[in-house]
A protein has these predicted regions:
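C-terminal regulatory/interaction module of P-loop NTP-utilizing enzymes
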Residues: 1-195
Length: 195
């Protein structure tokens, strides 16, 4: 209680203006929690947060998360966090596990074990959907081809492929590519032209 009540730890005192923030798991999530003593709990404000796909994507773009992971989660935002505390499965989709999956992709795993690695990271359902998306992603026209020939480059029909192309192109937005991007975006279905 010393930190919360006295704003100090031993001889160290927190500077004026500093706030104390504690984070933890909810008991209902069955994620190694311990009940907080009521006297301590009564000295805090308790808030629950939902995962925001938009906020996570903003973070992911700056944190070096793979483009295909970001594109997939734009396409299927409900899979960013898919936790069921009653499930017996060990792996489940969460912001942390998607970041970990991005690291697996960085390691360029053998295609024969790739799906198993994904299953063991984000769970069965999310891994299956991601693998389907990844197959489409890997068959897309290259960004270089689109920028070189925006009026004639392939425009995919599949929504997953369109999300993937838009994500890849967003990484190339710069003064020298604006005209090509606008030309290509004008050929996309209207709901994708603004991505």
């Amino acid at each position: 209680y010393q930190l919360v009540l006295d704003r100090r730890i031993g001889e160290y005192r927190l500077p004026d203006g500093w706030s104390i923030i504690a984070a933890g798991n909810r008991e209902k999530d069955k994620a190694v929690t311990h009940r907080m003593p009521s006297a301590l709990a009564n000295r805090m404000v308790h808030l629950e947060f939902d995962v925001s796909p938009d906020d996570w994507i903003l973070w992911a773009q700056q944190a070096g998360i793979r483009r295909e992971v970001i594109a997939f989660l734009r396409f299927r935002p409900k899979l960013l966090h898919d936790f069921d505390p009653l499930s017996s499965g060990k792996a489940f989709a969460s912001p942390r596990s998607w970041a970990f999956l991005s690291g697996i992709l960085d390691a360029n795993p053998d295609p024969d074990v790739e799906y198993e690695l994904f299953r063991g990271t984000v769970g069965d359902g999310a891994a299956a959907e991601f693998m389907g998306f990844l197959r489409v992603w890997r068959e897309l026209p290259s960004v270089e081809d689109i920028l070189a020939n925006p009026a004639d480059a392939l425009v995919p029909d599949d929504p997953a492929a369109l999300y993937a192309v838009c994500e890849a192109l967003s990484e190339k937005a710069a003064d020298g590519t604006v005209n090509a991007l606008v030309t290509y975006a004008g050929r996309l279905p209207s709901e994708f032209g603004v991505l």
